[in-house]
């Protein structure tokens, strides 16, 4: 039994509250255990200069933490005058992950800005950001469909992320909180689609190595968690969930 009473393959309690920010085209508050992240999606009718004239859209992300999202206060990066390497890595991860399940050509020359703001951190902030940002993105693009700006929802599959690790005492565990992450021999972030395809795997040993068998167990455990997260996403999105992949399926049948 883990310190918070969970079994090895159990997620922390997950809650996704949609339409959390009234001004954003899409927004959620995602809570996974004591980790809480506000995710918003903003649509701009333009693309970065390097994409102009190409007929494709773009999805990019920004990520940040409130100073007291953590146990000790961390100064805002704006006050330091630069973005940390960790923040840059997470921003790129979120953007890459979301672009993997969106038909950018169908989006047209629009940019969707994803903003993930961690208001309380207890492990898994980047994976919570991806899982919440996906819902915010679908809400924003669904609004464009409702307004007649898009013919159909340009999202071909679901997307979610979670963490797994190898605990010195408990072995392979799912959805690490901060204390578990700090003592894990191996920790890994996994991003997957609803079809069970991998989008990203980030795994490292901390003064330790791991075997192929352990890797397979880590990935299997992550997939179990991600399937549960996608079930929650479906429930939150309601009728909009049925539209995901619809255009892609129709095009496949017509070929």
From Swiss-Prot:
UniProt name for this protein: Ribonuclease PH
Top-level taxon of origin: Bacteria
Keywords: Nucleotidyltransferase, RNA-binding, rRNA processing, Transferase, tRNA processing, tRNA-binding
Keyword field contains Manganese: no
Matches recorded under PROSITE patterns: RIBONUCLEASE_PH (PS01277)
Catalytic activity reported: tRNA(n+1) + phosphate = tRNA(n) + a ribonucleoside 5'-diphosphate
Subunit structure: Homohexameric ring arranged as a trimer of dimers.
Enzyme Commission designation: 2.7.7.56
Family designation: Belongs to the RNase PH family.
GO molecular function: 3'-5'-RNA exonuclease activity; tRNA binding; tRNA nucleotidyltransferase activity
Binding site for phosphate: 86, 124-126
Gene3D superfamilies: GHMP Kinase, N-terminal domain
Function text: Phosphorolytic 3'-5' exoribonuclease that plays an important role in tRNA 3'-end maturation. Removes nucleotide residues following the 3'-CCA terminus of tRNAs; can also add nucleotides to the ends of RNA molecules by using nucleoside diphosphates as substrates, but this may not be physiologically important. Probably plays a role in initiation of 16S rRNA degradation (leading to ribosome degradation) during starvation.
């Amino acid at each position: 039994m883990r310190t918070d009473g969970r079994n090895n393959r159990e997620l922390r309690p997950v809650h996704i509250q949609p339409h959390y920010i009234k001004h954003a085209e899409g927004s959620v508050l995602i809570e996974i255990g004591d980790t809480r992240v506000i995710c918003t999606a903003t649509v701009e009718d333009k693309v970065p200069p390097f994409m102009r004239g190409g007929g494709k859209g773009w999805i990019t992300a920004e990520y940040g933490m409130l100073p007291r999202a953590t146990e000790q206060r961390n100064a805002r990066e704006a006050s330091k005058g630069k973005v940390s390497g960790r923040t840059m890595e997470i921003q790129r991860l979120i953007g890459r992950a979301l672009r993997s399940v969106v038909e950018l050509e169908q989006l047209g020359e629009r940019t969707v800005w994803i903003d993930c703001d961690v208001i309380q951190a207890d492990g898994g902030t980047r994976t919570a950001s991806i899982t919440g940002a996906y819902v915010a993105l679908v809400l924003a693009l669904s609004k464009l469909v409702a307004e007649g700006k898009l013919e159909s929802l340009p999202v071909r599959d679901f997307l979610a992320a979670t963490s797994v690790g190898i605990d010195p005492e408990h072995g392979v565990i799912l959805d690490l909180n901060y204390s578990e992450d700090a003592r894990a021999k191996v920790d890994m972030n996994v991003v997957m689609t609803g079809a069970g395809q991998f989008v990203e795997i980030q795994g490292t040993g901390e003064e330790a190595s791991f075997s192929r068998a352990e890797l397979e167990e880590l990935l299997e455990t992550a997939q179990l968690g991600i399937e549960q997260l996608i079930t929650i996403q479906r429930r939150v999105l309601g009728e909009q969930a049925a539209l995901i992949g619809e255009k892609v399926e129709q095009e496949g049948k017509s070929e």
